[in-house]
UniProtKB/Swiss-Prot annotation:
It is found in: Cell inner membrane. NDH-1 is composed of 13 different subunits. Subunits NuoA, H, J, K, L, M, N constitute the membrane sector of the complex. It is a multi-pass membrane protein. Its main location: membrane. One of its GO terms (cellular component) is NADH dehydrogenase complex. This is NADH-quinone oxidoreductase subunit K. It is an enzyme of class 7 (translocase). It comes from Pseudomonas syringae pv. syringae (strain B728a). Keywords: Cell inner membrane, Cell membrane, Membrane, NAD, Quinone, Translocase, Transmembrane, Transmembrane helix, Transport, Ubiquinone. InterPro entries: NADH_UbQ_OxRdtase_chain4L/K, NUOK/Mnh_C1-like. One of its GO terms (biological process) is ATP synthesis coupled electron transport. It comes from the Bacteria. The gene is nuoK.
Amino acid sequence: MNAIPLEHGLAVAGVLFCLGLVGLMVRRNILFVLMSLEIMMNAAALAFVVAGSRWGQPDGQVMFILVISLAAAEASIGLAILMQLYRRFHTLDIDAASEMRG
């Protein structure tokens, strides 16, 4: 089986990371911001796996499992905050969250 070249895997990870970063900066909806963060975390995990497979080390796969568990925790906490913001302000706009500061 032919492995994917390091350059191609890192290029895909870079494109995904940039896509998530653009979504993070452009969108004002909290749900889309959380989705953009997930895309960025998955891009970083992909870079770990590609780099680990290049040198034949299982460290990339271990980091992938760690990143996925971190992403699951981030998603659950983020969605809980999102639900509370929606219940309180009836909107998912980020500017509504700045009103919480007082």
